[in-house]
């Protein structure tokens, strides 16, 4: 953690909806005139697409499911060094993983490859979005570097529905191919993804109120209006719950550290919660400058 150069980390699995949270933060940054450096977890994958396919096949022959959820498939040591360097001096480096043809045009690299590393500096804060923002293993501890840690954790069936629909629509995969990926990733999901949500400051969990019992045949993703949002705070004593309840219609507290909000109030809830927290980080930063 660094008072002078704060780091915000958004952690969530593939299909969890972390991009939605990133979009809300971008709105806040623009409205509040805050400059942020952005890094994506995909940029720290260890292998490009073709090499990853070869690695998966190689490990499968040994009876091992090798996935992007694992620490071994990612350059987490490099990511930690970026967090540490930004926390010390406000500088760092990142790159982009090119997912599809549209990004290939944008970045000038082939799909499934990485762009060159680029340095960033002169920002108010660093914003990370990806799979491992709070990862802790025997060799790395990313959580210790982050000043605000947020988990995005839909209930598992909803997460799978979102992933299946996204991968089919944007990446051309079949339901069977996405299902195979989900199955291969399950051990790493349990060992590497889930433990991070015990280290976050705030978790957002979308819960559908329609039947999602078989996510592999779901024709539609439940809409925000067909969901509720459970928001858990690690330090509830610092949260103004009466204010949130008054501003978020039909919300209520389910536990002393949790509030339940209608699903279509996600954007408003995040803005009400995050804006004062960001201001606190920047006030602390300015006192240190």
UniProtKB/Swiss-Prot annotation:
Q: In which pathway does it act?
A: Carbohydrate biosynthesis; Calvin cycle
Enzyme type, top EC level: transferase
Give the binding site residues for ATP. Answer: 12-20
Keywords tagged on the record: ATP-binding, Calvin cycle, Kinase, Nucleotide-binding, Plasmid, Transferase
Q: Which GO terms describe its molecular function?
A: ATP binding; phosphoribulokinase activity
InterPro entries per the record? P-loop_NTPase, PRK, PRK/URK
Q: Name one GO biological process term.
A: reductive pentose-phosphate cycle
Entry EC number(s) = 2.7.1.19
> What single Pfam family name could you report for this chain, choosing any that match?
PRK
Recorded superkingdom: Bacteria
Catalysed reactions listed for this entry: D-ribulose 5-phosphate + ATP = D-ribulose 1,5-bisphosphate + ADP + H(+)
User: Which family is this protein grouped under?
Assistant: Belongs to the phosphoribulokinase family.
Name under which the protein is recorded: Phosphoribulokinase
- Please tell me the species this chain comes from: Sinorhizobium medicae (strain WSM419)
Q: Which gene encodes it?
A: cbbP
